[in-house]
Amino acid sequence: MRLAVLFSGALLGLLAAQGTGNDCPHKKSATLLPSFTVTPTVTESTGTTSHRTTKSHKTTTHRTTTTGTTSHGPTTATHNPTTTSHGNVTVHPTSNSTATSQGPSTATHSPATTSHGNATVHPTSNSTATSPGFTSSAHPEPPPPSPSPSPTSKETIGDYTWTNGSQPCVHLQAQIQIRVMYTTQGGGEAWGISVLNPNKTKVQGSCEGAHPHLLLSFPYGHLSFGFMQDLQQKVVYLSYMAVEYNVSFPHAAQWTFSAQNASLRDLQAPLGQSFSCSNSSIILSPAVHLDLLSLRLQAAQLPHTGVFGQSFSCPSDRSILLPLIIGLILLGLLALVLIAFCIIRRRPSAYQAL
């Protein structure tokens, strides 16, 4: 009987122990939080690459953010923050930012933090924003025109007059062409000729004292003439000249040309007379020459009508004219000798045969 009671008591104790096993205070259910990687939502602009890695440990959140931004040209990259919090999170951010900017640019990077429970998050963000800039052309304007062909008529002979009130002070009549030596794309050198169009040329100038000035402006360039009056020698001459223009020659490596010369003494004529020359070349520099064809110029003591005074020929025309005159005189004398010889041969003899 005693054994039965002991056996029943042991059985009841065993059943009671199994029934309360789930409520054992010493047994604890554990929820394991695995390591995780959080990729925040990032709004990317063109040319921006962002990589963010977040690792979870235990107690305190330390975030190190290194941002390198290189911007060329007007670029704006913005990353809006996204924060989701569950539980207690302690964040100690450390941010190192390096920005190199060439041109106006704005870059804003905000971190994204996600926390679950008591966690320590060490996000490492390496963000690089690169925006290619733009290249401005060295020549923003359209290419200049090709040089005009050599003229075959008198249409390119311009008549340019500058008047101070009602009194003209400079009168220029000529066909103007500019010769330049330019470098070709292959590294060689070549001469190019551009002819001035009178219909597209604007005349300006000044008539101050003994230094009259004439400025001819045309598309893509201008010519400047400065004259000097020598009252002691009673002459006037060209003392200064400058040229600047853009023209596109075949296979040229450049199209902007400029030169000036302030030590000239050309186109000299007596006061009150006009200077005339069939072809006068002015050297502004070894690579820039100005040719004045069929030239007629007067820069002092012009009448109110602006008509040219007595013509004063250039030395080159006089040197050609003198041999021509001498040759014509000799040719005339030879013709007279031949005519006299023919007349004598035709005259009958004064003696008659017996």
Swiss-Prot record:
Coiled coil: none annotated. Glycans are attached at N88, N96, N118, N126, N164, N199, N246, N261, N279. Highly expressed by blood monocytes and tissue macrophages. Also expressed in lymphocytes, fibroblasts and endothelial cells. Expressed in many tumor cell lines which could allow them to attach to selectins on vascular endothelium, facilitating their dissemination to secondary sites. The chain crosses the membrane at residues 320-344. Disulfide bonds join C169-C207, C277-C314. It comes from the Eukaryota. Residues 1-21 form the signal peptide. Sequence repeats lie at residues 70-99, 100-129. Belongs to the LAMP family. This is Macrosialin.
